[in-house]
Amino acid sequence: LTTPRHYAYVKIAEGCDRHCAYCAIPIITGKHVSRPKAEILQEVRDMVAEGVKEFQIIAQELTYYGIDLDGKHHITDLISDMADIPGVKWIRLHYAYPNQFPMDLLDVMREKENVCSYLDIALQHISDHMLTRMRRHVSKQETIELIKQFRERVPGIHIRTTLMVGFPGETDEDFAELMELSLIHISEPTR
């Protein structure tokens, strides 16, 4: 299968500094390295000229964009500037991390029509016991509050996530806690 002409992936960074217990990405790809903003924006302009309308923004850790450059989050400015490029119809954000999520990114999502109310964020688990074992550096309460903020600040947001079961040390109680989260906090009932 090929990617349709109107659709493109834009990689904004390579690597990851997180070192979660189950993940080999930092070993394989190395430390997080952000691409220069001007280079990314020019790539998007060039793709628009070729007929691309929908952009999937990807990185192993999207929300960390820019931290390696000067210690500050720059994902919000990047996405805002990208949304202002004539011809960009849709922008979707993939592979965010819950720890230190830049909340102003939600404002851009809400305010810019072409930034979809869609976020792919890897939660992995909800049990504090499992989050610690996985070295996720976020708690159950922080995760629940984050999801609540997503829903309050961007009504109708679509959250895509991955949840990991069977990680070594997971108990029946941990699993039950995870199922409760997925039913109550992530899923919205359909009618």
Cite the ranges covered by each PLM segment.
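Canonical Radical SAM [4Fe-4S] cluster-binding loop centered on the CxxxCxxC motif
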Residues: R5-A38
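P-loop NTPase nucleotide-binding/switch module
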Residues: L1-T3
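Residue-level detector of conserved catalytic or cofactor/ligand-binding positions
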Residues: S182-R191
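Hydrophobic packing within well-folded, soluble alpha/beta domains
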Residues: C16, C20-C23, I40, M47, ...
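Conserved alpha-helical substructure of the radical SAM core
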Residues: T29-Q56
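Conserved SAM/AdoMet-binding glycine-rich loop
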Residues: A49-D172
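A glycine- and small/hydrophobic-rich beta-loop-beta segment
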Residues: L163-M164, F175-L183
